[in-house]
């Protein structure tokens, strides 16, 4: 498991606890928030890894770094499944190109690991339990049936009480159009910043 919200995020901790019902869970996640870092890898400085607990590791890098290190250095073997999340906030439309959460699942797929990202469509008052239980259902299905080659899933769960999560839809990736506003300010030394 990994994420882009950091090793201390409640989303990854709730998800790890839920996924433990399916087998051994390892977490290799950024040591701090790394949202919107896309699929970047750290190439020009060393990466530090801190073992937090038996199967929990914090990396001072990006989510894609975490997956790369997990597969090639930290874990004793290739995992059966890679799950990235639970992200605080949805990952839809063009935003997936910036998402560390989604990119981590993509990185897993590049290593030949079935993978999915899971995000909670909210900006506050997160209901992680329902999303975690849904992730367990998806994980169980993938472990049993696999995914098509070179395919990963990007799952977005509404932030509603679990009893309202009764069905799912498979959709196509849409577009999100954001404004291009840039806020210019001046620091105390008279220098512009954005």
Predicted regions and their residues:
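N-terminal beta1-alpha1 ligand-phosphate binding loop
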Residues: 1-19
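Glycine/threonine-rich flexible loop motifs
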Residues: 90-99
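A cross-family phosphate/adenosyl-ligand binding-site feature
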Residues: 13-78
